[in-house]
Amino acid sequence: MKRIIFNFCFVWLAVSAFAGSKVVEMRNYGLVPDTHENLSPKLQKALQDIKSQVALGDKVTLLFESGRYDFHPEGAAVREYYISNHDQDNPKTVGFPLEDWKGLTVDGQGADFIFHGRMLPLSLLRSENCTLRNFSIDFETPHIAQVKILESGEEGITFEPAAWVKCRINEKGFFEAYGEGWSSAPQGGIAFEEKTKRLVYRTSDLWCPMEGVKEVSPRVYHAPQWKDARLKPGTVVALRTYYRPAPGIFLSNDKDTRLQNVKVHYAEGMGLLAQLCENITLDEFSVCLRGDKDPRYFTTQADATHFSSCRGKIDSRNGLYEGMMDDAINVHGTYLKIKQRLDDHTVIARYMHPQAYGFEWGVNGDEVQFVRSATMELTGGKNRVKEILPNDKDTVKGAKEYRITFAEPLDAEITDKEGFGIENLSWCPEVYFADNVIRNNRARGTLFSTPLKTVVERNLFDHTSGTAILLCGDCNGWFETGACRNVLIRNNRFINALTNMFQFTEAVISIYPEIPDLEHQKKYFHGGKGEKGVVIEDNYFETFDRPVLFAKSIDGLIFKNNVIRQNTDYPAFHHNKSRFRLLHTRNVKIEKNNFEDGDESIARE
């Protein structure tokens, strides 16, 4: 009887706090900072209790106190999630499983959420008008192993792991990092300059063979097969695999979501992955280090932010993105490939990339169009989905194939004898990306593939290593839609992009759709609305190399009123020796720019 009375009083105290003010003080559920205990069980109980006492639609704030909170896999939630552009291994262990909320705010008030093992820190699904603010996400033991080069020569490389890295030599003789419930034997890496934390010039993705590694003194290892003259003593290498099981924050099927003053310091996948969401605002959302004195050199295993098949508006501003292993932002949809044409209205279509399937592709009434994969040309007119059903599963969850019936007859050219993709036009967002800093990261700065208005302004792109801005589109490898029709890039500053080579890194700004048969392409992929399809104006470029703009298959491009300043910070090396390289383009204007060295060279092909 006493226990029943105690539990009743505990719940009454917690609920009464929010019943009047709609604020739940998480301390009342035992979620107290700086205890270093595993708070996963208490968090799950708190979320269940609060949800059971809140009417759907009530505005509720979960209020944490500032300080450190630890969450381990034991006692955490377990979910089956199919997350775009991540490894589709299930189940996922989830710290904050926030599902089916309206008007929810999670306010950390400076809380530092620390996760252990292999977890998805926070998910928000099927929710409306929700806000996440004032907290950070990190892991006690990242799955990337940071090491410092001590010696590098013909006999191999000697290195020292960072103090927090748990490591050993495994039974196969490989260097292995490990943590709570996981282990990893990385043989790839990214090299950083010790003092600047920039990627080392012309190193790109390193091969770091670890066969026969020996521990030559306590926590000092020698890898005889790892030989690389570019890696001088003092160089810091982030040893990594390409495994990406979960992002730091996962948003799916949400509407009107806001993230404010949220920092992701590490995640084994992307910092933020949003799919099938409508209207997302990021204000001071960052994927970043813990300041200048942070001993780490890396943040996330993949992109900082990634938006797959979203709609409405993506508004991202005032963020800091650094040290991540891919783009600061990537916006795209997903092509399905037609595998069978059953009749004039019906096809079997399939997700093609192994990291993109299992989530909803479309619903009845969605507008679609068709693209020929080889030339990336639109074929036939627009159509609408009359019915869409999973073909290889009983439910959408986990499905790779769909049986799709269209409202109008299919064009006779659209067959399963050659490659055709289907693009869902109803799930494309408008994008505003402004006042952000992107620096010291792998691969690219930003990537946009949406036909709706995209504005990129007042950002600083500082040593992004590859292309700073990429406009892509690919129905052959990544299967990421689509064409860019209305892009404005203005008042940005670019500092020494292209210190390394990665995919699509043809210039500081690269308009690079993946077109296997460009020779036979008659139409154009990007643009299409006259010369104002993509406008690049009033930007400032500082570069040590030649290529500023690469453009392929675009109708409508303006490059004007930009300043290009040549420096000697690094030796020029890029294979593209022209300021501008244009392949299969039309309606291009390059005018009123200031080239301090006078080089305005244009290569047209």
Curated annotation (Swiss-Prot):
Which spans of this chain does the record mark as coiled coil? none
Query: What Gene3D superfamilies does the record point to?
Result: Single-stranded right-handed beta-helix, Pectin lyase-like (2.160.20.10)
Q: Where are the PbH1 repeats?
A: 428-450, 451-473, 484-538
Q: Name one GO molecular function term.
A: alpha-galactosidase activity
Under which main EC class is this enzyme filed? hydrolase
- Signal peptide residue numbers: 1-19
Keywords of this entry: Glycosidase, Hydrolase, Repeat, Signal
Answer yes or no on keyword Glycoprotein. no
- Its Enzyme Commission number? 3.2.1.n1, 3.2.1.n2, 3.2.1.22
Q: Catalysed reaction(s)?
A: Hydrolysis of terminal, non-reducing branched (1->3)-alpha-D-galactosidic residues, producing free D-galactose; Hydrolysis of terminal, non-reducing linear (1->3)-alpha-D-galactosidic residues, producing free D-galactose; Hydrolysis of terminal, non-reducing alpha-D-galactose residues in alpha-D-galactosides, including galactose oligosaccharides, galactomannans and galactolipids
The task this protein performs is described as:
Alpha-galactosidase. Removes both branched alpha-1,3-linked galactose residues of blood group B antigens and linear alpha-1,3-linked galactose structures.
Family recorded in the similarity comment: Belongs to the glycosyl hydrolase 110 family. B subfamily.
Query: Can you name this protein?
Result: Alpha-1,3-galactosidase B
Which species is this record about?
Phocaeicola vulgatus (strain ATCC 8482 / DSM 1447 / JCM 5826 / CCUG 4940 / NBRC 14291 / NCTC 11154)
Q: Which gene name does the record give?
A: glaB2
